[in-house]
Amino acid sequence: MKQYLDLASYVLANGKKRKNRTDTDTLSVFGYQMKFDLTNSFPLLTTKKVNWKAIVHELLWFIKGDTNIKYLVDNGVNIWNEWPYENFKKSPSFQNETLQEFILKVKTDNEFAKQFADLGPVYGKQWRNFNGVDQLKKVIQEIKENPNSRRLIVSSWNPSELEKMALAPCHSLFQFYVEEDKLSLQLYQRSGDIFLGVPFNIASYALLVYLVAHETKLKPGYFIHTLGDAHIYENHIEQIKLQLTRTTLDPPQVVLKSDKSIFAYSFDDIELVGYNYHPFIYGRVAV
């Protein structure tokens, strides 16, 4: 994925040091766009191994309208664990449990999970119930009935509920576009963590194009990724530099193995074929 490596190189060369809500400064630029052709390949990063299982389960979690991490941790996906844990640490029920002990309680105690493992009205809630509107279902119906519409938009940015969210939406708004028999999507992402988050976001929204295209009897077209604050955390700079020394490998393919509704898809209905990658590179998330 040359587009991603070009982004990383650009931010290393042009980014300005900025403070933020976390304790780790960033190199940041404002305004950057990438475009991925989804016609014959899938944009999953090859210069390090990316957790495909986490990408798929997180997207299905969004689509279901879920906001509780129990579904994720039950399926071995731990990308959201830190946020509810930080909230739990502020509660009177906290007894110095470690993060690992917290997650074990989420897995084994349904009442505990209901009380402490919810992230608030984050992505899934907004996609499926934005002040009473099922945006995802509505936009899919609109694609079918009025494909030339310029209002094929889903927003995760709900100002009336931001304070209730564990994390304000980073990927905040997306728009579909139909041209002949192809479906494209443009994402506006207000904040992009280039090392950890952006590779996930690229793959997640590309997969969303595949799923919605399948649902609407269209073919995948393009994924356009527009970033607002595109940044590299200072503790990820060496990892990014390592990636830039690696050769991009041929991209994989994605095969959808079911004709069921997008709202009924499971992990086993989605197959990743031919994913070759360089070794995993660890980086710590900034909470």
Curated annotation (Swiss-Prot):
Gene3D superfamilies: Thymidylate synthase/dCMP hydroxymethylase domain. Pathway: Pyrimidine metabolism; dTTP biosynthesis. DUMP binds at R21, R150, R151, R190, S191, G192, D193, N201, H231, I232, Y233. One of its GO terms (biological process) is methylation. It is found in: Cytoplasm. It is an enzyme of class 2 (transferase). One of its GO terms (molecular function) is thymidylate synthase activity. Its EC number is 2.1.1.45. InterPro entries: Thymidate_synth/dCMP_Mease (IPR045097), Thymidate_synth/dCMP_Mease_dom (IPR023451), Thymidate_synth/dCMP_Mease_sf (IPR036926), Thymidylate_synthase (IPR000398), Thymidylate_synthase_AS (IPR020940). Its main location: cytoplasm. It catalyses: dUMP + (6R)-5,10-methylene-5,6,7,8-tetrahydrofolate = 7,8-dihydrofolate + dTMP. Keywords: Cytoplasm, Methyltransferase, Nucleotide biosynthesis, Transferase. The active site is at C170. (6R)-5,10-methylene-5,6,7,8-tetrahydrofolate binds at N51, D193, A286. One of its GO terms (cellular component) is cytosol. Catalyzes the reductive methylation of 2'-deoxyuridine-5'-monophosphate (dUMP) to 2'-deoxythymidine-5'-monophosphate (dTMP) while utilizing 5,10-methylenetetrahydrofolate (mTHF) as the methyl donor and reductant in the reaction, yielding dihydrofolate (DHF) as a by-product. This enzymatic reaction provides an intracellular de novo source of dTMP, an essential precursor for DNA biosynthesis. Belongs to the thymidylate synthase family. Bacterial-type ThyA subfamily. Homodimer. This is Thymidylate synthase. It comes from Mycoplasma genitalium (strain ATCC 33530 / DSM 19775 / NCTC 10195 / G37). The gene is thyA.
